[in-house]
Amino acid sequence: MPPRPSSGELWGIHLMPPRILVECLLPNGMIVTLECLREATLITIKHELFKEARKYPLHQLLQDESSYIFVSVTQEAEREEFFDETRRLCDLRLFQPFLKVIEPVGNREEKILNREIGFAIGMPVCEFDMVKDPEVQDFRRNILNVCKEAVDLRDLNSPHSRAMYVYPPNVESSPELPKHIYNKLDKGQIIVVIWVIVSPNNDKQKYTLKINHDCVPEQVIAEAIRKKTRSMLLSSEQLKLCVLEYQGKYILKVCGCDEYFLEKYPLSQYKYIRSCIMLGRMPNLMLMAKESLYSQLPMDCFTMPSYSRRISTATPYMNGETSTKSLWVINSALRIKILCATYVNVNIRDIDKIYVRTGIYHGGEPLCDNVNTQRVPCSNPRWNEWLNYDIYIPDLPRAARLCLSICSVKGRKGAKEEHCPLAWGNINLFDYTDTLVSGKMALNLWPVPHGLEDLLNPIGVTGSNPNKETPCLELEFDWFSSVVKFPDMSVIEEHANWSVSREAGFSYSHAGLSNRLARDNELRENDKEQLRAICTRDPLSEITEQEKDFLWSHRHYCVTIPEILPKLLLSVKWNSRDEVAQMYCLVKDWPPIKPEQAMELLDCNYPDPMVRGFAVRCLEKYLTDDKLSQYLIQLVQVLKYEQYLDNLLVRFLLKKALTNQRIGHFFFWHLKSEMHNKTVSQRFGLLLESYCRACGMYLKHLNRQVEAMEKLINLTDILKQEKKDETQKVQMKFLVEQMRRPDFMDALQGFLSPLNPAHQLGNLRLEECRIMSSAKRPLWLNWENPDIMSELLFQNNEIIFKNGDDLRQDMLTLQIIRIMENIWQNQGLDLRMLPYGCLSIGDCVGLIEVVRNSHTIMQIQCKGGLKGALQFNSHTLHQWLKDKNKGEIYDAAIDLFTRSCAGYCVATFILGIGDRHNSNIMVKDDGQLFHIDFGHFLDHKKKKFGYKRERVPFVLTQDFLIVISKGAQECTKTREFERFQEMCYKAYLAIRQHANLFINLFSMMLGSGMPELQSFDDIAYIRKTLALDKTEQEALEYFMKQMNDAHHGGWTTKMDWIFHTIKQHALN
């Protein structure tokens, strides 16, 4: 199911001409040609058409124009009925300018909703109706129960529940204020400014309150009422009654954006308030009548689509209507027959022969040796060969999969043979109804991904490539007299008890497990110590075979160390049903673990549905909405490792997205941004469909965002393709002319920011918009903030739109920096990182937040003249900061620069962020330093003449040292520099304590297909920089050495910067 074929207004045409001839077919058989404006609405076109039709024969056969709608063929080759007649001709995405007039039939509302959903996800919903796979149809029906449940939850307490869905509280996970933030308060109190609109002309009045930081919003409102009524000279009893009467009628809103304090959290737990305390700013809140918020909330009505009433297309055995037998009663080894291949595209002169390589895998681990077919000539790839595997059918685990690839062999006699995969595919050995696959099957294979080093791709997607013009392999599984099912839990438990008692030499009894457990509790102290040591190792450290045996023999004691579960699962022999059955019994009653630990069980190493189900239950129990938002990128990625469409993780994420609109917003965009990827377009498309069906009126907001993004993609495509040779002036003229057109003005104004749905983008400030100079022609866009109190937050919103750069790596790096910042803040380290907003919204398309009042180091150096620009004057940066921060605020600016520089030194070192130069390090006017453009990480650095260009572990040039030491001659001998080093050491050790979390977050991203994150070897770079094989003392010494290299090797960075500056000047 590919995404949309083009971003143009007609097939193969970016922009329609201003006037266009449209062929209109009327119900009386007449064809009328109309000249229409490209921006004309359908209602205008219809009116003109019926006026014109009176001049043609048979016009008396036509009914009134309101009885008809238009229908046409779109660029997806789909027939679409246009019910919304306010749509413009240029926005219909027609294949050709043909319109047919028809009388509408069928359920109008459902058709309109289906069109809106199709537009949002980028493919027509009817494509799902045509899929014959029963798993797809059952998923679509069954997932509606989650949708219904979520909608019912939103309506539970009427308006308040609905408000909580639309405006979920934006709070920190914990109410605890870190000590260094608490110390910024005045004896635990905070000054808050409360604003009230006092007239229809929006006249404002403000009240300044000093309140305890842990007050709940209702107490703040009560205090505001007391202050407001002070002039009324009420008695204490009257005041009490007044407060009681009005306190519950108001709510607090953040001035300048759509954020509300709707729940009884301590004030300082709200993120807005906490950031104000940290930055030393006074929070501005607006007092608003609860009723006015409730009255503008949309009423959600969720209607079951017509397909929910269709009967399942699953075969009778799937519905339990035919005789079945347990997998465990079969007494034969697994075998598979490879029949033949078609569409194998190879160069016969280069390739001698081809063969099929196969393996049975559980996650990335083989369950037995791989087996190859005979080699055959490429011209006629037929095998008809049974392959026998060294594994009994009863020993197949639930998540077993067959992995295969067609491979070529190259090499003459005596020379070393070269084996190369041509195409790969994977098949689940059990379908979604627990049934063992049987009979013949044709599998369309996938192209080999960049960076695949092995012949098989066991962690790749299962199932057939929807593109039928790819290599196709025909194969056959054994047939059995009855349908073969994986045993249920009661049979598994019985077998586990039997195998434990056999192992322990007890008689077969249900008391077997508990007796075994009692013996396990009498472990020697050094065994317990060894278990604890294994438990604390990072997820990438190898577990030896001896350690696996040791873990397994003490598996019952392991229950007392719940977080050891991932290591224990890796020690299970998944090709032994005895061990798997016992592990299932342990997992069933395993104590819950922290969400950060549970997430490890969702990566590609843990495919078993029981294990993944346990992980999801831990997330349901302990993962706050704030933490879920923080880890959402990874949780969406690991959906790719789920065996089937319907699973507990999908249900958990969908329910969260449908009960918290902020989570839903990013859930939508993370899924939508991968719809071009054929390996996941069906899975993600189905999930998007179910989200869009139940997200209520937010679908209209999402479609406004999608429409705006489509317009910007079209514009930038023209700039890169048709206007690439024009001057900047000509390109800018074209941009402004296009943006002034009515359809562009409609689409690009008055919608919610995809970067942050609490921010509204009002009117475009065209005079402030520009095309940036880099190769992909990004757009710098500027919108007004339409909020009534915008001057108290920001009056305009600047965003960079990029078309042509993959922003997923930037998005991941910024997320990791944000998590590092949280860890540091919670440990009392205020390193003032600036992880600005960044969102990938499609294939190499995305948005980046512009940080206000910031400049690149190069811009600052260029202000210092040629000498500064060419880096020979290291004092330029310090002088610039001094000029910007005169008097008392100078010390604060240097302190801010020092803290942020320390944070970014540590972060860029740990993450191996490359390509650092003076155009991607920025400084704000107040001294805060931050990095941008994270195109290279995990030590994949840019190369020049075959060598890695950067030769120091992180950037710490003389320019920075001079600022940190306040301009001292010998920078590294100052107290300020010592303090800076101390900050770096503390920051490094703090992240090292959380190494497992960062390794897990990167491991969960392995399925993303990012070029620099392909395997566990890439992630091993973090093990190296955090020195996880060393003691804490040794790790600190290692980091100190790296830091020493950085400031002594500063001249090499300087040379890189000089070359970069010269190159940029040449480009400009």
Curated annotation (Swiss-Prot):
It catalyses: L-seryl-[protein] + ATP = O-phospho-L-seryl-[protein] + ADP + H(+); a 1,2-diacyl-sn-glycero-3-phospho-(1D-myo-inositol) + ATP = a 1,2-diacyl-sn-glycero-3-phospho-(1D-myo-inositol-3-phosphate) + ADP + H(+); a 1,2-diacyl-sn-glycero-3-phospho-(1D-myo-inositol-4,5-bisphosphate) + ATP = a 1,2-diacyl-sn-glycero-3-phospho-(1D-myo-inositol-3,4,5-trisphosphate) + ADP + H(+); 1,2-dioctanoyl-sn-glycero-3-phospho-(1D-myo-inositol-4,5-bisphosphate) + ATP = 1,2-dioctanoyl-sn-glycero-3-phospho-(1D-myo-inositol-3,4,5-trisphosphate) + ADP + H(+). Residues 771-777 are annotated as: G-loop. Its EC number is 2.7.1.137, 2.7.1.153, 2.7.11.1. GO terms for molecular function: 1-phosphatidylinositol-3-kinase activity; 1-phosphatidylinositol-4,5-bisphosphate 3-kinase activity; 1-phosphatidylinositol-4-phosphate 3-kinase activity; ATP binding; insulin receptor substrate binding; protein kinase activator activity; protein serine kinase activity; protein serine/threonine kinase activity. Residues 517-694 form the PIK helical domain. Residues 931-957 are annotated as: Activation loop. Residues 187-289 form the PI3K-RBD domain. InterPro entries: ARM-type_fold, C2_domain_sf, Kinase-like_dom_sf, PI3/4_kinase_cat_dom, PI3/4_kinase_cat_sf, PI3/4_kinase_CS, PI3K-type_C2_dom, PI3K_ABD. It is an enzyme of class 2 (transferase). Phosphoinositide-3-kinase (PI3K) phosphorylates phosphatidylinositol (PI) and its phosphorylated derivatives at position 3 of the inositol ring to produce 3-phosphoinositides. Uses ATP and PtdIns(4,5)P2 (phosphatidylinositol 4,5-bisphosphate) to generate phosphatidylinositol 3,4,5-trisphosphate (PIP3). PIP3 plays a key role by recruiting PH domain-containing proteins to the membrane, including AKT1 and PDPK1, activating signaling cascades involved in cell growth, survival, proliferation, motility and morphology. Participates in cellular signaling in response to various growth factors. This is Phosphatidylinositol 4,5-bisphosphate 3-kinase catalytic subunit alpha isoform. The lineage of its organism: Eukaryota, Metazoa, Chordata, Craniata, Vertebrata.
